């Protein structure tokens, strides 16, 4: 008789309670991952095709393929105006802000859509703060088992150690062997070599790819420096006859993938002032730099004794465009943002081996985004997902 009865909470309240518990604890990573694909160009095109006016404007832009690779002659200026008018009609559609992702499926299709919607940019009207790629947060930690390096001599250089770590990792080893075979001197076919290089730097874990390419060497260790310089198989990957840098850039701009990677590099490795203030974080600049490897604009270390990088091209014969050509050269060889990003990554790699981790597997998470809203949420044991809601629900009865 002394007991009081209270009605059970409605089912909707219970569901809301469970969701409120689950989202803060475990949804941080999944939401960040899902949001990366909210407005991909492939999805935006599907939305556009559902609207007759949008579909017609997009199809008209699709017929303007000639404007995607070269400026139009004067007699075709009317066609160019029509293309730009169609692009203007799409400014209120989701296509105008769509982006692609570096490791997405059907990346080539996505980039084709992007450049169809932005024909003016493909003609050289480059906006340095706009990249076709959405800048996402890297959430996977670096995991390496240094104990497996005991088979190497203690004084082995770090480039050899990173190469061994790749060899001991099935996926990295498979991808590295694929481009090694395609880029070998006997079988060298440059287009196949470049394709396999792109595959390696797109599919291998960043920890392995960056470790191989950006391994630090002692100044006097020429063997280590040569191993680092040969990482991308330059004898096959780089042009046999050194082209003019502006011609190389024009060739790159004619290809949607190369154009996109160059645009990404310009966006994230661009010094904004004479003091060398960089537009974005070092991790983004490095990712954009690695994205160029395997394209016509593949850069590399110029020697085995330093860490200066450059394009494999020359400015001889540039005529009135000499200054523009030299500026393009300096965007790699004397770029303060790129220089410091490479130096910082090499310092990080050196620190990994400076501690006594020989008997353990270490995991390092580098913060890739300064926006607190995009930072990774702490992962709690899965047990908490089942226990906490039950405890809280029990108090309601």
Swiss-Prot record:
Residues anchoring lipid (GPI-anchor amidated asparagine): 371
This protein's encoding gene: Gfra3
Summary of subunit composition and partner proteins: Interacts with ARTN ligand and RET: forms a 2:2:2 ternary complex composed of ARTN ligand, GFRA3 and RET receptor. Interacts with SORL1.
Gene3D superfamilies according to UniProt: GDNF binding domain
PANTHER family recorded: GDNF FAMILY RECEPTOR ALPHA-3, GDNF RECEPTOR ALPHA
GO cellular component: cytosol; external side of plasma membrane
Molecular function per GO: axon guidance receptor activity; coreceptor activity; glial cell-derived neurotrophic factor receptor activity
Recorded family membership: Belongs to the GDNFR family.
Role played: Receptor for artemin (ARTN), a growth factor that supports the survival of sensory and sympathetic peripheral neurons. ARTN-binding leads to autophosphorylation and activation of the RET receptor.
Cellular location(s): Cell membrane
Membrane topology: Lipid-anchor; GPI-anchor
Main location class: membrane
Source organism (scientific name): Mus musculus
Record's protein name: GDNF family receptor alpha-3
Keywords: Cell membrane, Disulfide bond, Glycoprotein, GPI-anchor, Lipoprotein, Membrane, Receptor, Signal
